[in-house]
Regions:
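Secreted/periplasmic proteins that engage bacterial cell-wall peptidoglycan
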Residues: 120-202, 206-207
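Domain-level detector of nuclease and nuclease-like folds
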Residues: 177, 185-294
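Bacterial N-terminal signal peptides that target proteins for export
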Residues: 35-47
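C-terminal motif of bacterial Sec signal peptides marking the signal peptidase cleavage site
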Residues: 57-59
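N-terminal module-boundary/linker segments of secreted carbohydrate-active enzymes
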Residues: 71, 76-147
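Short, Lys/Arg-enriched N-terminal segments with co-localized hydrophobic residues
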Residues: 12-36
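Bacterial signal peptide processing site
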Residues: 61-64
Length: 294
């Protein structure tokens, strides 16, 4: 797909800037699915680099902000297994970490029964979609029925704390994560992340916000859109470049490269769909069922 190719190239360009830009003692950058807000200390050269990065990432649906991640695993990184990840069938509210593989015949049968409940319809137009229609990125003021909301810590750091291991925090804070180890479900690799290389890990909206908009969220209240954008059920910290390749694709067009996790991914997509009464396309539902067959 053209959008996936463009996002992949843009993410590559942004990564080059982050890797080779001049060092800086302190920075705080947030990318909000197509918009970059930057606070810098340490020189105009890096400021220019950050502006370039925002331009490179603009328009890529599903990209989480650089401040949310970092340190993507290098080629040949150790296999992650599932770490502390929970089976999504046993994690219906998304408050437990990660996505564990669904492997048993009994669990696959449960998964298919869940996916069968998902309604289908054609994908509507993207007209009028803007990220801000779902609230500003990673707000802590989502409706109170959303887990982790209004706890004094923004959504992205809540998710890094949920899924990360060996956490380190900014001095004087129990919210802002500065380094962690992540068992990435999408690639099956272990990522040693630091905030100084933030763009390498992103927070994925499993059911992308643009997809939500096209499937009915355009008619929702603002509160309901803010809920799905910040609900931990719909959010997973993952390898940044891999997430960049997803764009706003449904399961018929994109699945995690780690095949053993695909049934779990399909289940999580279905859980979000059912909770928010959002249909999926018929090809997406067929692909979801296929991942949990056998």
């Amino acid at each position: 797909m053209r959008i996936e190719a463009r996002c992949g190239l843009n993410l590559f360009l942004a990564t080059v800037v982050f890797r080779h830009g001049p060092p800086v003692p302190e920075r705080n950058t947030q990318t909000e699915e197509g918009r970059t807000v930057t606070r810098l200390r340490g020189g105009a050269a890096l400021a220019v680099a950050m502006v370039f990065t925002g331009s490179a990432l603009a328009g890529c649906e599903g990209l989480a902000p650089p401040a949310d991640g970092g340190g993507a695993s290098a080629s040949g990184a150790p296999a992650a297994g599932d770490g502390r990840a929970a089976n999504p069938l046993d994690n219906p509210d998304g408050t437990k970490p990660g996505l564990a593989a669904i492997t048993s015949g009994a669990d696959k049968e449960r998964a298919r029964a869940l996916i069968e409940k998902v309604a289908t319809k054609g994908r509507g137009p993207r007209t009028g979609y803007e990220r801000d229609k779902f609230g500003y990125a990673w707000m802590d003021s989502a409706p109170r029925d959303v887990p982790f909301s209004r706890n004094g810590c923004d959504t992205r750091n809540d998710l890094l704390k949920r899924d990360g291991e060996d956490l380190r925090f900014r001095s004087g804070s129990d919210c802002v994560v500065t380094s962690l180890t992540l068992h990435d479900p999408y690639t099956g690799e272990v990522i040693e992340w630091t905030k100084s290389h933030a763009i390498k890990v992103q927070i994925d909206h499993v059911m992308p916000l643009s997809y939500d908009w096209q499937m009915g969220a355009s008619r929702w209240t603002e509160d309901k859109r803010e809920s799905i954008a910040n609900d931990p059920l719909n959010l997973v910290p993952v390898d940044g470049p891999t997430n960049g390749s997803k764009g706003d694709s449904g399961p018929a067009s994109w699945l995690p490269p780690n095949k053993r996790i695909r049934c779990a991914y399909a289940v999580r997509f279905a859980q979000v769909s059912l909770k928010y009464e959002l249909p999926v396309t018929a090809p997406d539902k067929d692909m979801m069922l296929k991942q949990c067959s056998g």
